[in-house]
Amino acid sequence: MENLQLVLFVLGAVAIIAVLVHGFWSIRRQQPKSLKESPMTGLYTDKTRDSDGFDADGVGPVRVVKNNAEQGIPKATSTSRATPFGARAQESEPADVSPSFSLSDEPKQKAPRSRQEPVMSATPNEEVSDAHLEQMELGLGQAPAQPSLFEDPVTERKQEAVRPAPRVEAPQSVAPASVEPVSVEPEPAPKVAEETPLGDPQDVLVLHVVAKEGEALNGAELLPSLLTLNFKFGDMDIFHRHEDNAGTGKVLFSLANMVKPGVFNPDEMEQFTTQGIVLFMTLPCYGDPLMNFSIMLNSAHQLADDLGGEVLDGGRGAWSEQTKQSYLQRIRAQM
């Protein structure tokens, strides 16, 4: 058993070492080669150049241009070529020695020519001496019509600045066209249908809510019930039911005290008692008379349930289905 454990331990250690070695080898394999091992290293070495400083592709060394602001003439340095500076200047562009005369007093401006930058060398030992420059100026002075090979860049900038600016004509002021005022007519307000007067009442529908024999309706219970049914105290000191539940609009039907004088005092409702109340609706009325009568009948039944009374017709008779149908016929007769 101990030998088996030892063998398993050795095998596990060997497996771990193999996994680590394989991981390091994979990481090294995925890393990019260094610049020294790259096969493109040879491309970055300096190519061989000939005696004139040009390589096999005809590309020369980097040229540096220097300007001498004190003398007004840029100093030029020759390259490694053996050709003298004055000879190269004469070979590059032949001089036209024939002088040109003009009768006009205004001097003519020479057309700008393509300027060739001189080849400069960054080596201070190869700069042209002042005597050499004087000889070059004397040699070039024989051809007055020949333009200088090296023109001062500041002079070119001044000549460019002398060029006349293009004329910009001021835009002619155009008188604005007369705009006629447009009259906007206000939209007519929606016409409200004028309410036709109802005229004199032709019929009155009456319902009674009376207390049971030997009892009375209590005002402390009557007032909350009336407010719940959206009645509002108003004209003639009685309660009215309006078109709107908030107590606004036309009166649909009213509620009065059955006992003379038939009025209520809201401040004394807690001490108020009565034998009954009466609900009445005149015909014709505002709105739908059938709907108004249905609301009045439901209110009468609700008050009877809340106060412990009963509903009677206009003659204080028992309310029945036949009585209801007769009331509906009276309503339809007025429609």
Swiss-Prot record:
Cytoplasmic side: 28-335
Cysteines paired by S-S bonds: none
Main location (coarse class): membrane
Pfam families attached to this UniProt entry: ZipA_C
Cellular component, GO, one term: plasma membrane
Region of interest called Disordered, as start-end residue ranges on this chain: 37-128, 163-185
UniProt entry keywords in alphabetical sequence: Cell cycle, Cell division, Cell inner membrane, Cell membrane, Membrane, Transmembrane, Transmembrane helix
A biological process term (GO) from this entry: division septum assembly
InterPro entries: Cell_div_ZipA (IPR011919), ZipA_FtsZ-bd_C (IPR007449), ZipA_FtsZ-bd_C_sf (IPR036765)
Membrane topology listed for this record: Single-pass type I membrane protein
Positions of transmembrane segments: 7-27
NCBIfam families named among the record's database cross-references: septum_zipA (TIGR02205)
Annotated family: Belongs to the ZipA family.
Subunit structure, interactors included: Interacts with FtsZ via their C-terminal domains.
Protein name per UniProt: Cell division protein ZipA
Organism this protein belongs to: Shewanella loihica (strain ATCC BAA-1088 / PV-4)
